């Protein structure tokens, strides 16, 4: 594991113009151990970052540069806030130079290249690097992340579903029926990215609430692969994502049928014990109901454990900011571990209210 030194970590960002890119900039500009070194955008080459994102005035003095002009191999770590396929095309060169890679897209999330190619419709060009990569969900893979050279940063939906279900199934626990799991998830519009699309237009998304990807969503195989790794066997999951008319935030309602032999389990205590030492996972008091606004612009994820009527249906409520714990904040959390830094370095922001 690389150890943090007195010198700052030299950080590059490929694809700094999207929402996850600017969120990385916001977080890293406040990080006590980071020196932002390069931010790439072919289209915005030469444009000062603060001209595009005025919230960064006085914080980020760099200008965007075309990828071929940026000295990414001089960085200690490079974040890819890019479409799928970009990181895998550049990873080998960076790794050869000793630069670590954290990809916020899906290039290193799925270990099965056939599954990746089926869902993302592009060939996987570096299966050897993929085999050495680590799935970057800190609360599940902390030790492996600390030694990793390549991180596949989890998707936003998978983060809520996996952390919401892990205490129930990890280690092959026989507490709930793993064949009938349901994830009913809602995301703010920023989850669709910054590109111009009809479905993200104000007139389309405002005052509207809709499901999408019901027949199949790219995060489904990612979630199932990790659930099966936790459970040690096959898992059945019904996953239905929704788009809600807010900018940022995610609310996932998870359903699990309690097995007869587990009816006397104290599920509140189970979750509290599992996440007692996690700096960014908050298991709320019994009977509490989480709200997306309670995590806005923070790296916190809040979980509420519910058992309506004391019956056999367990309901787990999970909220996070899809751009922070669901993307860029989680990526910074991974970087901290990779370089031997305190896990919460640069991530201690309090959520914004109202």
Curated annotation (Swiss-Prot):
Name of the protein: N-acetyl-gamma-glutamyl-phosphate reductase
Keywords of the record: Amino-acid biosynthesis, Arginine biosynthesis, Cytoplasm, NADP, Oxidoreductase
HAMAP family given in the database record: ArgC_type1
Pathway: Amino-acid biosynthesis; L-arginine biosynthesis; N(2)-acetyl-L-ornithine from L-glutamate: step 3/4
GO cellular component terms attached to this protein's record: cytoplasm
Record-level GO BP terms: L-arginine biosynthetic process
This protein's record includes keyword Methyltransferase: no
Active site: 156
Pfam families: Semialdhyde_dh (PF01118), Semialdhyde_dhC_1 (PF22698)
Enzymatic class: oxidoreductase
Family in the record: Belongs to the NAGSA dehydrogenase family. Type 1 subfamily.
Gene (name only): argC
Function: Catalyzes the NADPH-dependent reduction of N-acetyl-5-glutamyl phosphate to yield N-acetyl-L-glutamate 5-semialdehyde.
